[in-house]
Regions:
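Loop-helix junctions at membrane interfaces
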Residues: 1-173
Length: 173
């Protein structure tokens, strides 16, 4: 890799890192609070990083998102679950890193087979989004069943039905 492309990648990575930090820390920019939960659009930035820069950089940008999600949960929680749930790096960091991994790998595999950027990007975006939503909600439900069920006002036995409804709603919006 020549110096120009190393510099280019460094600058793009820095810009995407700054965007992630802004989206995470500025209210309503990346996390949109809706009642006791928040919708996020930040995964789009991670997916773009994975598609444009590759899997490794997508994972790095996802790591930045996860770390700043955890910092935000400690410093300025926006929902009742933030302080209890998103201070756990298994929930705040791991799914975000895996968004970059899944999106980057799928884009690379599909692009190599089809040479179609748009198709590879669409599949990477869909599965990157699903990765974040499913992992965060599943980990929340499994690690904090009682707390999450109580917060959503449902019985623990009905928690995963409720979380499934949230996942579907997030997928549509």
């Amino acid at each position: 890799m020549n110096t120009k492309s190393k510099t280019y990648r460094l600058v793009i990575r820095a810009i995407l890192t700054a965007i992630i930090i802004l989206q995470t820390m500025v209210p309503f920019l990346g996390f949109i609070p809706i009642g006791i939960t928040s919708l996020t659009i930040i995964h789009i930035t991670v997916i773009v990083a994975a598609i444009v820069l590759g899997t490794k950089d997508g994972m790095f940008i996802g790591l930045v998102w996860g770390i700043f999600t955890m910092i935000r949960a400690f410093t300025s929680p926006t929902t009742p679950l933030d302080i209890a749930v998103f201070t756990n790096p298994i929930i705040s960091v791991v799914p975000r890193v895996l968004v970059g991994l899944v999106a980057g790998l799928l884009f690379t595999i599909i692009y190599k087979k089809t040479k179609k950027v748009v198709a590879a990007s669409i599949v990477a975006a869909i599965f990157g989004t699903i990765t974040n939503t499913v992992l965060v909600l599943t980990l929340m439900g499994n690690l904090y069943t009682g707390l999450v069920a109580n917060t959503y006002g449902v019985d623990a036995s009905a928690l995963f039905v409720t979380l499934g409804g949230i996942a579907i709603t997030n997928g549509i919006s």
